[in-house]
Amino acid sequence: MNKIFAAFKPKGLSSNAFLSTLKKKYKNKKAGYSGTLDPFAKGVLIVAFGQYTKLFRFLKKTPKTYKATLWLGVYSLSLDDQNIKEIQNIKEFDLANLKQIIDQMQGIISYTPPQFSAKRINGTRAYELAKKGIEANLKPCQMEVFDCKILSYNHPFLNIEITVSEGAYIRSYCELFARKLGINATLSSLERIKEGKFVYNNEKSLNVLKYINLKPNFIKDLNKLENGAKIFVEELEFHDEGDYYIETEKYFSIINIKENTVKYLLNKVEKC
């Protein structure tokens, strides 16, 4: 069974553990996901079955949008509602001041990923090492904040909606935001509501061709795709270098054009 959809991962499960529940639910062992959410976070997780597990690298998965609740005045080793070491009663902030900092933190931001993150270190998630008391050597990164707005402020809880680039960590954004206020802060909740064009819709099966970040190409002799025969650039409508998809009534293939040579990246993937 080929299928791709947006699932809703609950809080408290790793993305791998959640995928295992979906494998059992749909009775399909060949499954995968893209865009890991660590156990603290909940929300949209792109899941695929069958041949569609090979399509993740072609999907348009940015920007990503999250809803987050910042708990002001709280110090947590994991920057979430666990491992809390200190809770301070701090004075309520002026909303205009908070909005000013939000506006300042737009565009490219440099940061170091948090120890409790889904970042892989030699094949192991950073949060798994952190739980064992092992501090990972995480390199500085950059993320882009496309938009951020305050949804509500009920001191000490600040609710925001933030849209960011792939690879961004909202925990790190929270930490940087708190530094500008001169306080500690942690996340009390985190939900991914959108990943690219993917939104949760009761695990409805999606037309993958509407979600891949590729242009269509065309060939008159569709039998070549059916048979996996060699394709020459001259037979295609578009000759520019790059990746494309070509579809028939029942299947589609993904090809690459480079130096006037056509190569199959995936061939005869059955439509769902």
UniProtKB/Swiss-Prot annotation:
Pfam families listed in its UniProt record: TruB_N (PF01509)
Function, as annotated: Responsible for synthesis of pseudouridine from uracil-55 in the psi GC loop of transfer RNAs.
EC number: 5.4.99.25
Family: Belongs to the pseudouridine synthase TruB family. Type 1 subfamily.
GO molecular function: RNA binding; tRNA pseudouridine(55) synthase activity
Organism: Campylobacter jejuni (strain RM1221)
Location of the active site: D38
PANTHER family, alphabetized: PSEUDOURIDYLATE SYNTHASE TRUB1, TRNA-PSEUDOURIDINE SYNTHASE
Top-level division of the source organism's lineage: Bacteria
Reactions catalysed: uridine(55) in tRNA = pseudouridine(55) in tRNA
Enzyme class: isomerase
Residues in coiled coil: none
Name of encoding gene: truB
InterPro entries membership: PsdUridine_synth_cat_dom_sf (IPR020103), PsdUridine_synth_N (IPR002501), tRNA_psdUridine_synth_TruB (IPR014780)
Name of the protein: tRNA pseudouridine synthase B
Keywords associated with the record: Isomerase, tRNA processing
GO biological process, one term: mRNA pseudouridine synthesis
